[in-house]
Regions:
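A hydrophobic C-terminal alpha-helical subdomain
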Residues: 224-284
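Cofactor-binding loops of NAD(P)H-dependent oxidoreductases
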Residues: 49
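Oxidoreductase cofactor-interface core, primarily capturing Rossmann-like NAD(P)-dependent enzymes
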Residues: 1-41, 52-55, 59-66, 73-76, ...
């Protein structure tokens, strides 16, 4: 069996895809710029490659028919890198953006959305079998957004606390990816992936508190206050995108889909289950 190549395997979803493929006994090859930063199963093969330098991708692509792609490079690298990859493979599963999710949270124009659309168009024109994954809000964002405040014992200060989302566990995204990478029947399919519940951001923080066994103090920030507090830690385009999306989605429940169950036959994991599995990230 030829290995499956994972491009972008150092991130939250890529690591889970690598782990779940290895658990199934599927050989994997992980392409990354910095091999020293990788820590995977010994079953994995590691190859150095940089999407911004397409000529470095050839060694990783040797003997590869199937690729899982998480784009982790500047937009300027899209065309030359994808041309190099797509001319050598037969199947690609791309972790895209929720471009077609019928909800205001995902309909705000932004750079990430435009980049995802560009990549999809190039893949579609290549003639390869493709599958696009469109996850909504990632449950692991909670660690980035609220982890430090919760660990420190401070109040969780956050904007748009009553805006609902349907956070999805990274294990469920990976489970869908693994099916699409290893089974037939997923060519030219687009899967919208969400968690099983519409939960306000306030409710998500309260669930984390419940898992930790303590009541968390929560304070609402205005959009202006949030911008000032978030900009030191997050890029301006990300902050702008999030604030605009939360504002647009503040008056209606989150979109909850059935993509995970449809592909895997199992229900998506709840946010409570995710928080329980990641409780250590919120403890001192």
């Amino acid at each position: 069996m030829n290995p499956i190549l994972i491009i972008g395997g150092t991130g939250t979803v890529g690591r889970q895809v690598a782990y779940q493929l290895s658990e199934r006994g599927v050989p994997i090859r992980v392409l990354a710029r910095n091999l020293e930063a990788l820590s995977f199963s010994r079953q994995a093969e590691f190859v150095r490659g940089d999407l911004t330098q397409p000529e470095t991708l050839d060694a990783g692509l040797d003997g590869i028919e199937t690729v899982f792609l998480v784009w982790v490079a500047p937009p300027v690298a899209v065309v030359p890198a994808l041309e190099r990859v797509l001319r050598k493979i037969r199947r690609i599963v791309f972790l895209s953006a929720p471009l077609k999710t019928p909800h205001p949270l995902f309909q705000q124009p932004n750079a990430a959305r435009n980049l995802g659309l560009q990549i999809e168009q190039i893949i579609e024109a290549s003639g390869c079998d493709w599958t696009f994954l469109r996850p909504g809000m990632f449950a692991p964002n909670a660690k980035e957004w609220w982890g430090e405040q919760i660990r420190s014992g401070k109040a969780v200060r956050w904007p748009y606390l009553d805006t609902p989302t349907a956070p999805i566990d990274e294990r469920d995204i990976a489970a869908v990816a693994v099916r699409a990478l290893t089974e037939n029947g997923h060519a030219r399919m687009e899967y919208v992936l969400t968690g099983p519940q519409s939960l306000t951001q306030r409710e998500q923080i309260e669930i984390i508190g419940k898992v930790l066994g303590r009541s968390l103090q929560i304070e609402e920030l205005s959009p202006e206050e949030a911008r000032r507090e978030l900009l030191p830690d997050f890029p301006r385009p990300v902050v702008d995108m999030l604030l605009e999306a939360w504002a647009a989605a503040s008056c209606q429940p989150a979109f909850v889909g059935t993509g995970v169950r449809h592909v895997t036959g199992q229900p998506a994991r709840s946010f409570f289950e995710w928080a329980t599995n990641n409780a250590a990230a919120f403890r001192t």
